[in-house]
Amino acid sequence: MRFACFVVLCFSGFAVAADVKSGPQVGSTLPGPFEPLNLNGPDAGDECCLFCKYGNSPVVMVFASKPSEKLYKLVGELEKAATAATGEVGACLVVTDPSAGAQKALKTFADDAKLKATIVGVIAAEKQKDYELAKDAEVTVLIYSKRVVRINHAFKSGELTDKAIAAVTADAAKHYSGK
C-alpha cells in the first residue's frame, strides 16, 4: 500500500538555501502530531494527522507560507517521485495560510494536477509552533524516515528556483529508493 503526504523533500544533509534555518534540523526527531485540514485524498475535508498516517515510512513533507506557482511545480515533481516509489512512502504539502482563498487555490491545484500520492492541507501557523518554522522561510522541506529528519531544505521568498526544485526532487527520489 502506498501512502501519501506531501511536502514534505536525501542524504546530502544540507539546506540548499543555507542562510535560513527552518524546522527540525538533520538528525533531530520530529516534534510529533499535528492535524491540518486535508484538501484532497481519502481524508479530504477532515483534519487528519499526516505525521501519524505515515508512521515510519520515508516521507517528504513540505511546509509553505502561501501557495505559489513555484510551489506547485515542486509539488508536481514530488508527486512524480512518490508515485515512482516501489514501497510505502508519504508526500504532503502543508500551507500555513488557512484562509478561504488559499484553500480554494490549493484545492484547485490538487484537482487540476490530479494528485494521487500527495496530500495537500492547510493549518494555522500557530498550530505548528513545535516545528519551529522560520518566519522568513517561505518553504521548508523535511525529508524524513522513522520520524528522524534526514534532509532539511529551507527557502526564503524567491529562492525556490528551478535548480532548487531539481535538488529537492533528487533528494526525495533517493530517499524514497532507500539510497
Which residue stretches match the model-derived regions?
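Positively charged n-region of N-terminal signal peptides that target proteins for export
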Residues: 1-4
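Hydrophobic h-region of N-terminal signal peptides that target proteins for export
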Residues: 8-17
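N-terminal "domain-start" segment that seeds a small globular fold
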Residues: 19-48, 69
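Short active-site neighborhood of thiol/selenol oxidoreductases, capturing the structured segment around
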Residues: 47-72, 89-92
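Thiol/disulfide oxidoreductase modules built on the thioredoxin-like
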Residues: 54-56, 125-165
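Loop/turn elements at helix/coil->beta-strand transitions in domains of secreted/extracellular proteins
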Residues: 55-60, 86-91, 115-118, 138, ...
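Structural microenvironment flanking redox-active thiols in thiol-disulfide oxidoreductases
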Residues: 67-110
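Short, internal strand/loop/helix patches
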Residues: 109-134
